[in-house]
């Protein structure tokens, strides 16, 4: 019988994770190892295996746990509005922008943002995302002012 560390058992109970497969236990262990770091994390795996739980584990066991946690399904946001959703926009940036709006990167400042289905983002948005990953900087739609954000990105 495989012996499971008590902290892994506690995480399974807390997050409703069922199963004792070695790969699952190893994935939880890795999530616990990266949680205290400030590294961005890419989670890979088959569709439907519960990858969305791991960003929550990483956030809850990080120094950012008191900050905002935002999960974004990138595949569910229309291409025409994705930049506004992620980066925010200024009043008058486009038809219907009657006021300025914070995007998820500004809202999650000090916390964690989980970008599910990140590969579904348009290439132009992926280029803007790269800037956030590299320097923590972004520009709202309709603005020329560079803003800083201090977030952990999990995708």
Question: What do these predicted ranges mean?
Answer:
Residues 92-99, 134-140:
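Short gly/ser/thr-rich secondary-structure transition/capping motifs
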Residues 1-22, 29:
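Conserved ASCE P-loop NTPase core motifs with emphasis on AAA+ ATPases
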Residues 70, 100-110, 114, 122-128, ...:
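AAA+/SF3 P-loop NTPase mechanochemical coupling elements
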Residues 16, 29-95, 106-122:
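Conserved post-Walker A coupling segment in P-loop NTPases
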Residues 31-34, 132, 136:
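AAA+ P-loop ATPase catalytic core
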Residues 2, 6, 29, 57-60, ...:
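CheY-like receiver
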Residues 25, 56, 84, 127-131:
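Surface-exposed alpha-helical interface segments used for non-catalytic interactions
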């Amino acid at each position: 019988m495989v012996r499971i560390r008590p902290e892994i058992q506690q995480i399974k109970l807390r997050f409703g994770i069922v199963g004792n497969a070695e790969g699952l236990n190893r994935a939880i262990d890795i999530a616990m190892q990266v949680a205290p770091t400030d590294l961005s994390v890419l989670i890979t795996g088959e569709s439907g295996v519960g990858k969305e739980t791991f960003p929550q584990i990483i956030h809850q066991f990080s120094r950012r746990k008191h900050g905002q946690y935002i999960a974004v399904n990138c595949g569910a946001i229309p291409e025409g509005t994705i930049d506004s959703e992620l980066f925010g926009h200024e009043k008058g940036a486009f038809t219907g922008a009657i006021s300025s709006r914070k995007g998820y990167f500004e809202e999650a400042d000090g916390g964690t943002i989980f970008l599910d289905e990140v590969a579904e983002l348009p290439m132009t948005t992926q280029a803007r995302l790269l800037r956030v990953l590299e320097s923590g900087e972004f520009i709202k739609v309709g603005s020329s002012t560079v803003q800083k954000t201090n977030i952990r990105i999990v995708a």
